[in-house]
């Protein structure tokens, strides 16, 4: 593949943008090499500035569940733009969006729109602290909830790639209010709540970890956390920025049958546009300003164009059989990847929940953060580049989940597996 134009753009970007990018994982630091620059996207494909086409399993990090540039979403955006870009005042779309979310996710009796997943999680923990009168927050090793100071403590995703336990600039006093548990460890969670349960305002978790690759919860684990939070008066917060409306229509909470107190959502509710939301029980959400004393605001919250895009996408995912079909395709992809790896003599295991999957270069079943970090990362990096050169784009980090969309049809999956058969041989080194 020719990458001359991408190389030229990256050289320019490095003079003006820190690391040449606006989000660290895009820089390919983990896998080596340089990123390609996208010119357009359509369906299951990205097209770069050099004219190369890639099957996309990143999906803008999850939200493009109906594929890129879907005609219905595109038409909704065009119609909304004709009426204006931003009002700074209420619009009908945000009411319809709230009605849609509360109908599809019953634990969310009320919702507040924001502008990103990070903003949603920051607002949710502020609400948890304000509602309980407590200060401590519990999170999990390998889970990532955005770049808020309270979360950059043994964080996953980009922070895990950089190999540092926290970020400079986070006050020690604030980080001390964040308690970190090993994911999928029943005993550790019980012990922590027995010791400090009276000080814990809330526990925030990715119900399926998507930022240390894809790690599903052990059977009964989420139920265990729900019981601990209820017993000790802490709020259970599900970060469904990745899993919401993807692993099931009602998100991971519907898939696993758990009712959290608060839920955060990200750009999937904006059809991929910059947007987020948080919601929960009415008595909690009524404490948010102006109804209550806990302050949170946003000039662009409920943006009319983002609401139109999100509503169009959420209409599509409600079609009968949508999620079952995606789950079946994901299962077929994962089985094919494991078979191709076995044929090449490469130790690989996969995980999946709905249309979200993980690929680990290990023979072990991965259920913990420690197991994820112990995988053969150099082998993944070789595999990544071998796939990329054949026109298949995986997340440029061994610590990120993969995502399918309804545009990933049988032909796309077969093309992916054909590339994988070649790439696994390259991964052996």
From Swiss-Prot:
Disulfide bonds: none annotated. It is found in: Cytoplasm. Pfam families: Aminotran_3 (PF00202). Its main location: cytoplasm. Pathway: Porphyrin-containing compound metabolism; protoporphyrin-IX biosynthesis; 5-aminolevulinate from L-glutamyl-tRNA(Glu): step 2/2. One of its GO terms (molecular function) is glutamate-1-semialdehyde 2,1-aminomutase activity. Gene3D superfamilies: Aspartate Aminotransferase, domain 1, Type I PLP-dependent aspartate aminotransferase-like (Major domain). Keywords: Cytoplasm, Isomerase, Porphyrin biosynthesis, Pyridoxal phosphate. Its cofactor is pyridoxal 5'-phosphate. It catalyses: (S)-4-amino-5-oxopentanoate = 5-aminolevulinate. This is Glutamate-1-semialdehyde 2,1-aminomutase. The gene is hemL.
């Amino acid at each position: 593949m020719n990458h001359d134009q991408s190389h030229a753009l990256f050289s320019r970007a490095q003079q003006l943008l820190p690391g040449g990018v606006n989000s660290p994982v895009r820089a390919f630091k983990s896998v080596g090499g340089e990123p390609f620059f996208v010119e357009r996207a359509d369906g299951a494909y990205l097209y770069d500035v050099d004219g190369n086409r890639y099957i996309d399993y990143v999906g803008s990090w999850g939200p493009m569940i109906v594929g890129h540039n879907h005609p219905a979403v595109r038409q909704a955006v065009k119609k909304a733009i004709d009426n204006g870009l931003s009002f700074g005042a209420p619009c009908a779309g945000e009411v319809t969006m709230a009605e849609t979310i509360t109908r599809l996710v019953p634990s969310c009796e009320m919702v507040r729109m924001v502008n990103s997943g990070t903003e949603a999680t920051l607002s949710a923990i502020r609400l948890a602290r304000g509602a309980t009168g407590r200060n401590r927050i519990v999170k999990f090793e390998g889970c990532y909830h955005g770049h808020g100071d309270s979360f950059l403590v043994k964080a996953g995703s980009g922070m895990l790639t950089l190999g540092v336990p926290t970020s400079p600039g986070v006050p020690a006093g604030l980080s001390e209010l964040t308690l970190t548990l090993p994911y999928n460890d029943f005993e550790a969670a019980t012990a922590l709540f027995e010791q400090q349960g009276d000080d814990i305002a809330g526990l925030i978790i990715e119900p399926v970890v998507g930022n240390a690759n894809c790690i599903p919860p052990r059977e009964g684990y989420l139920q265990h956390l729900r019981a601990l939070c209820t017993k000790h008066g802490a709020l259970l917060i599900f970060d469904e920025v990745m899993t919401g409306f993807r692993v099931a229509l009602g998100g991971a909470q519907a898939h696993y049958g758990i009712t959290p107190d608060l839920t955060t959502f990200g750009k999937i509710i904006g059809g991929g546009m910059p947007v987020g939301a948080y919601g929960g029980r009415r008595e909690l959400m009524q404490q948010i300003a102006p109804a209550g004393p806990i302050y949170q605001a946003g000039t662009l919250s409920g943006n009319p164009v983002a609401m139109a895009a999100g509503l169009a996408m959420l209409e599509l995912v409600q079609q009968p059989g949508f999620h079952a079909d995606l789950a079946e395709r994901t299962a077929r992809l994962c089985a094919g990847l494991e078979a191709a790896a076995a044929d090449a003599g490469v130790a690989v295991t996969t995980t999946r929940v709905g249309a979200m999957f993980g690929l680990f270069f290990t023979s072990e079943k991965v259920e913990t953060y420690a197991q994820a970090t112990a995988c053969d990362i150099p082998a993944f990096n070789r595999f990544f580049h071998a796939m990329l050169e054949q026109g298949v784009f995986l997340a440029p980090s061994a610590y990120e989940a993969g995502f399918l969309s309804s545009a990933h049809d049988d032909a796309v999956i077969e093309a992916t597996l054909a590339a994988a058969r070649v790439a696994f041989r390259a991964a052996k080194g």
